Amino acid sequence: VKVNIVEKGQIFFAAAFTTPPKVSAVGTASSQKIAAFSVGSRLASLDEGILNSLLGGLLGTTVSLKLMDYQGLVAADVNALHVVEALAIDLKLTAGTYKDVLKTEITYGQFLNALTKTTGLQPAVANILKTLEKTANKSNIKLKLEEILNLGPSSDKLIGSGENLKVTAGVFDLLNAAAVAGNGGNQLALNLNANVLGLASVKATLAIGEPPIETPSLAVGGQGTIVRTAQTRLAVNVVVDGLQAIAGLKVNIPLYVEVAHAEARLADIRCTGGGQGTVDVEVVPGVAEIALGNADTSAFANFGKDPRVTKAAIVDSALLAINGSALINATNMTKTKLTFTQSDITQAKIKSISTKDTVTTLVSSLLKNLNLDIRLLFLNLDLGGLAGIQAALANTLAVVTAPVDQLLYNVLLVLGVKIGEADVRVTDVRCQQPALVQ
């Protein structure tokens, strides 16, 4: 707020031959209102094999954590501001600002080491991170913390003067966000053969878009600050064999999933007294395109261009040929306003939104829209004609619907992505008293 005061001055000795001058003063006062908030999706179920494959793929090494390890990491929270402070000690930047640390390039191992020494972390969780750190030291990926954390106006403060701001983040979310940032948008090839029960083989190609540095999934800022999840493309090729319903023929299920980033915008902060406040956040979930078909992965990581998806050979043998394709979309782009009271903020309560047409069972939804071309190449093959073949194929695919759904769900959630949904939480709000700044 800028205030300009003008008053008529007083003169004494010169009052007989001149008029009194006008005297003015200008002052500017500022009242800063900020909040710490994040967007993402918390893992509700865990698959040890998928998690190890994906994290290992991002790091370019082999990860062998146990299910209990992941459960501990998912359950743990940490103050990201304290992570920066721990890293500042390691980097000998304690006399600098938070921005100095955020902009310094570090290895993934250095990040994990700082995470283990962060104030408030449970010893059991720190031990898990130390185990992962030994593996990460074999990786050569590097990152800058500004790629996963935006501290806004707090960036210019000296290390240790963060005024106990609660920038709460999940430990699992942080280590995965750092792995994605360090990977630099490279395309990943994952072989999940032994990890998904009931499927002969599973191969996946994954590409993760790089969000602008100013909009990571965790931030501190005032009205208008934006956080986003990663834009993600996933092509999965599932093979099921030995299925008697269609004469023991091998069935190929190629799936393509593209999820746009979910976005949360700090819409308003209303101060309620005593430094407390209520925060409004506008959220748009990550909409998706899901297809059954062959996706061209040659330029998968180029998010400026849509990959071509063509009809796929679901069954290809000397006896029978079945080609098919399907496409579904979750396309609701309506903003949803979430309001966080002071009680919600104190408890770091997670609130969720979803599209009106959320895809809850991806594969079964695709099968309802499946277009098939069936060619019976061996006339004596008795499958009851075209209707019988369609029924046999439907029964075969129904068997693998649940494990493939679980596969897609887990791979995307590791990246903080849930199709058509988003989880948001506000963990601190500051309503500072007006102060003269000029």
Question: What is each PLM-predicted segment?
Answer:
Residues G72, A80-H82, L93, K103, ...:
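Low-complexity, compositionally biased segments
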Residues K33-L121:
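Charged, amphipathic alpha-helical linkers/stalks
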Residues F111-N237, D241, A245-R265:
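Extended non-globular C-terminal regions
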Residues Q10, G60, N79, T107, ...:
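Helix N-terminus capping/helix-initiation residues
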Residues T62, L91, L115, T119, ...:
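Sec/Tat-exported extracytoplasmic proteins
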Residues T61-V78, Y98-K103, K130, L143-E147, ...:
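Short glycine-rich, low-complexity/disordered patches
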Residues V1-T62, L197-L199, A207-Q438:
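Short, conserved structural patches
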